[in-house]
């Protein structure tokens, strides 16, 4: 699996209220969430992001309240993948469930990648590339890879109802 796009770089402890502010949840339908993605951290993000772009972040991305809409907002904004030093577990599981690739880096990718860099996330080689710079990536669990390939856990289970991935 591989994704290439422009990097949007954020620091440590990006919480779900920065990913999709709570005030937006009462005013918009699910289909409109992408218009407000990351506006708690960067109000201009929805205008800057393009289909296939990659979010690069520090530690504890997606912390805060359990908010499935945070993942949905990123997907609807066109984000192809999120690479971070670490993820809050609830966000990470929501991302697997919804089919948004979330890949942990072995070292802080924000020390190498700059906002606007063209990056490639290569899971075959377990590396994030930004020009001549590389950041090693942790190998995601097999069930996460399967869910990402199918577009989420629900789609994976629909295609394999007699063999859910958690039984392996």
From Swiss-Prot:
Name of this chain's protein: 3-isopropylmalate dehydratase small subunit 2
Family annotation (InterPro entries): Aconitase/3IPM_dehydase_swvl (IPR015928), AconitaseA/IPMdHydase_ssu_swvl (IPR000573), IPMI_Swivel (IPR033940), LeuD (IPR050075), LeuD_type2/HacB/DmdB (IPR011827)
Pathway(s) this gene product operates in, as recorded in its UniProt entry: Amino-acid biosynthesis; L-leucine biosynthesis; L-leucine from 3-methyl-2-oxobutanoate: step 2/4
Keyword list, A-Z: Amino-acid biosynthesis, Branched-chain amino acid biosynthesis, Leucine biosynthesis, Lyase
Keyword Amino-acid biosynthesis tagged: yes
PANTHER family in alphabetical order: 3-ISOPROPYLMALATE DEHYDRATASE SMALL SUBUNIT 1 (PTHR43345:SF2), 3-ISOPROPYLMALATE DEHYDRATASE SMALL SUBUNIT 2-RELATED-RELATED (PTHR43345)
GO molecular function, one term: 3-isopropylmalate dehydratase activity
Record text on subunit structure and interactions: Heterodimer of LeuC and LeuD.
Annotated family: Belongs to the LeuD family. LeuD type 2 subfamily.
Organism of provenance: Methanopyrus kandleri (strain AV19 / DSM 6324 / JCM 9639 / NBRC 100938)
Enzyme superclass (EC): lyase
